[in-house]
């Protein structure tokens, strides 16, 4: 379980998060919802240790390895889809995961040859390949059609059986996957 107690974070004197309290279970899908500019991405950055809170404490995340997909897919442009996933796994695992996310036959494509939804799936495959102690997905269903959303949703559900999956989404299907959630406002 990860506990955020009285978390506050400001940028340039403007509070983005103010006295936020959240308990994230050790498994299952946890949702972070809210309008744009409400601190969802900041909360993710705090959870993974990319930033420190101005106040409060985060309990239970010390030493955790987070596997993260941010809003921007952050694929390496000089590497193929297979190369991007193989950075964190062996080639056989990378091929299997690309197959699982519906990209069989696209392994040798470079990021600039992929659609937005395909890039998103490469990023998700890479995050799954990395493993980590928890999976954090910022808008995992962006650019995906309904059938692919359900397919990716099943993969997320399987992963969440043993580890926490934290998703930030505006997508109604994505929201339906969560067992617990918080709305930032």
Model-flagged regions — what are they?
Residues 138, 145:
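ABC-family nucleotide-binding domains
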Residues 110-114, 118:
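Conserved ABC ATPase signature
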Residues 2, 17-19:
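Conserved structural motif at the start of ABC-family nucleotide-binding domains
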Residues 33-35:
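The feature captures the beta-strand-to-loop junction immediately N-terminal to the Walker
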Residues 124:
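Hydrophobic anchor residue at the start of the ABC signature
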Residues 48:
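Helix-to-loop junction immediately C-terminal to a conserved catalytic motif
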Residues 92-106:
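Conserved ABC ATPase "signature" region
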């Amino acid at each position: 379980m990860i506990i955020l107690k009285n978390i506050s974070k400001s940028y340039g004197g403007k509070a983005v998060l103010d006295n936020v309290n959240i308990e994230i279970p050790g498994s299952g899908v946890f949702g972070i919802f809210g309008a744009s500019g409400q601190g969802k991405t900041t909360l993710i950055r705090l959870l993974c240790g990319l930033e420190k809170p101005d106040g409060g404490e985060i309990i239970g995340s010390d030493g955790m390895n987070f596997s993260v997909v941010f809003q921007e897919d952050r694929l390496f442009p000089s590497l193929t889809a297979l190369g991007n996933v193989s950075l964190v796994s062996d080639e056989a695992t990378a091929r299997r995961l690309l197959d699982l996310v519906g990209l069989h036959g696209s392994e040798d494509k470079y990021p600039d040859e992929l659609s937005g939804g395909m890039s998103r799936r490469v990023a998700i495959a890479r995050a799954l390949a990395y493993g980590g102690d928890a999976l954090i997905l910022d808008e995992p269903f962006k650019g995906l059609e309904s059938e692919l959303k359900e397919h990716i949703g099943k993969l997320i559900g399987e992963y969440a059986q043993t580890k926490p999956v934290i998703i930030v989404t505006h997508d109604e299907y994505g929201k339906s996957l969560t067992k617990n959630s918080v709305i930032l406002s």
